[in-house]
């Protein structure tokens, strides 16, 4: 029997870039900090995919999204990104190419979801996206494949009071649905700016620190 293939996915999140590359957030130059994290990622073997889970820009400027792509992209490595509460989704759309396409790595389906709610810091996965996701999970179940889910807002309370008031409002509903499907193995998110790990049923929930934390 052939050995199973291991895939590497690099996640960037909450870079909070601005139109001005010299801009700082809480005393940190966000462009410089993103470059430092990207350089660290690039010091390892090339990944199979790069996923960016929102709040890539702090001001929603087109320049900030192009700079983000320039800093994190690697030759011939697929990039997928999605909006957070600080992002301008329409501007992101103008700056994206293949980033909107589904991503498949062997038996793994990497699914990105938009949890942004316009005008709000809290997030939610809309009903249509949930219906579509359930269909994708059922299809993966049928052929014994796996799903990695990616979005911005935290679906679980983390203990950080100021973040737990602006979490994913339907996180419990989402996790209940995921645990009906054996293909659902993990989800990654940003938003909270710190590390978070928990297992809920068969789903590993991973929150990732901000590149400018």
Residue ranges and their predicted role:
Residues 62-78, 165-175, 202-211:
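Short, electropositive alpha-helical surface patch
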Residues 1-67, 158:
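N-terminal active-site segment of His-dependent metallophosphoesterases
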Residues 21-23, 52-73, 88-99, 123, ...:
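Metal-dependent catalytic neighborhoods of phosphoester/phosphodiester hydrolases
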Residues 37-49, 123-204:
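His/acidic metal-ligating clusters that form di-metal
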Residues 79, 99-124, 132, 136:
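Active-site gating/metal-coordination segments in enzymes
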Residues 11-13, 49-55, 79-85, 114, ...:
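Active-site neighborhood of phospho(di)ester-bond hydrolases with catalytic His/Asp-centered motifs
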Residues 77-98, 157, 209-212:
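Active-site HxH/HxHxD metal-binding segment of metal-dependent hydrolases
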Residues 2-11, 102-112, 137-148, 199-205:
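Beta-strand-turn-beta hairpins that frame and shape the catalytic cleft
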